[in-house]
């Protein structure tokens, strides 16, 4: 790739050396990293292989399970529903899902769900051992068991499942065409952005390029699917519908998504979101509150838990010096999303940089945090 005038080529090359050292040390198996500045390619490199069990070489066209980066797509669908006047940020969820009534549930708004301050438990599954690939079954279980542990707005605690599953169901119920969540996602987001290699579930034509995720014992639960494809088979299901973790994509498609965010909701002349909502999404709404989901692990590793710095569904670097996957050197307004132990996207509007990292070999939550901070700092340090 030709040298980008916005980067010091030698310093950006440190990124290649660092990832290769990590792979040699066995920290993870491989991946692909892409960097753009001002919309122009600056770095694109593949590394290693998918893993010891499904040992495919990583290619630029490889399809990765995105895990919780999927939540970023659900955020956009909620924003589009706001733009169309179906809901507002302060609309209580129970206005859209009447079954979600009673007690503290009725205080929970879309704002609380997006900022992970709804007071719902930070659980990975609604019922132990249930299949998670059918959205209707998961929603039925959530409506039965999801009881707030504290009033909405009191604390910040990342919700792996409940918040975005419920918002995905709300989007489905609000749709005047009666479409499935999967179809709304494809027709209202992926197709307008030209994300042709992105889908909810592993679309049949993508299966041969899909790198089946290796969890390496670093995740607290199984992810069962109805086809009985293994302990984490939900991530191989063609028709999975999981608004919190279920999408697959490529580095190229995810860069298109990141660039849309950097450009304020528009890409290649197609606007999928108004600038006001993008601005709201990248505004910190959680004050100085830490994210309780990560705080204990950071402290145990010898760090200081920083403020959560959450916008509307997106994480933000923030002005404080502290641990950040986006890099300690990132501009304060850098924002993006990450997925379990593997995937990361961010955009730095101040410097005009967009970053996509899709890796194989799932790391623990804390190791993943340190890994991305270290690698992303190389990118920031190389910027001119």
What do the predicted segments below correspond to?
Residues 29-31, 42, 180, 341-344:
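Short loop/turn microsegments at loop-to-beta-strand junctions
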Residues 89-103:
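Short, glycine/proline-biased beta-turn/loop segments that scaffold the active-site neighborhood
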Residues 3-66, 88, 372:
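Short, conserved catalytic-motif segment at the N-terminal edge
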Residues 13-20, 33, 39, 62-91, ...:
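Active-site SXXK
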Residues 51, 103-329:
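Short, surface-exposed loop or secondary-structure junction motifs
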Residues 42-43, 345-346, 352-361:
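Short, well-ordered beta-strand elements
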Residues 334, 341-350:
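Short, surface-exposed beta-strand/loop micro-motifs that present aromatic residues
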Residues 361-384:
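Generic C-terminus detector
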């Amino acid at each position: 790739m030709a040298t980008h005038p916005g980067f010091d080529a030698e310093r950006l090359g440190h990124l290649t050396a660092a990832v290769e050292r990590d792979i040699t040390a066995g920290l993870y198996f491989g991946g692909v990293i892409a960097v753009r500045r001002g919309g122009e390619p600056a770095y694109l490199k593949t590394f290693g292989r998918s893993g010891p069990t499904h040992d495919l070489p990583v290619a630029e066209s490889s399809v990765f399970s995105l895990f919780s980066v999927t939540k970023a797509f659900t955020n956009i669908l909620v924003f589009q529903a706001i733009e169309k006047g179906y809901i507002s940020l302060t609309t209580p969820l129970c206005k859209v899902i009447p079954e979600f009534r009673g007690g503290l549930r009725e205080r929970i708004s879309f704002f609380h769900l997006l900022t992970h301050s709804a007071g719902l438990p930070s659980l990975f599954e609604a019922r132990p051992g249930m299949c998670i690939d059918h959205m209707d079954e998961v929603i039925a279980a959530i409506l039965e068991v999801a009881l707030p542990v504290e009033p909405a707005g009191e604390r910040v605690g990342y919700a792996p499942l409940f918040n975005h599953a419920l918002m995905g169901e709300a989007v489905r119920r609000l749709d005047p065409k009666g479409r499935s969540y999967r179809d709304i996602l494809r027709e209202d987001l992926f197709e307008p952005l030209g994300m042709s290699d992105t889908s909810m579930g592993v679309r049949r034509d993508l299966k041969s390029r899909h790198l089946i995720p290796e969890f390496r014992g670093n995740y607290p639960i199984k992810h069962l699917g109805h086809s009985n494809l293994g302990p984490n088979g939900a991530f191989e299901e063609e028709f999975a519908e999981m608004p919190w973790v279920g999408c697959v994509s490529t580095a190229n498609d995810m860069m298109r998504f990141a660039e849309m965010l950097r450009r304020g909701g528009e890409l290649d002349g197609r606007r999928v979101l108004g600038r006001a909502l993008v601005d709201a999404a990248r505004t910190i709404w959680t004050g100085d509150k830490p994210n309780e989901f990560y705080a204990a692990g950071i402290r145990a590793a010898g760090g200081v838990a920083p403020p959560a710095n959450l916008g509307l569904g997106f994480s933000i670097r923030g002005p404080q010096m502290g641990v950040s996957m986006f890099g300690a050197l990132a501009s304060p307004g850098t924002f993006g999303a990450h997925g379990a132990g593997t995937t990361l996207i961010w955009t730095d509007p101040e410097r005009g940089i967009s970053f996509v990292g899709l890796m194989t070999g799932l790391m623990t939550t804390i190791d993943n945090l340190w890994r991305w901070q270290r690698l992303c700092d190389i990118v920031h340090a190389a910027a001119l």
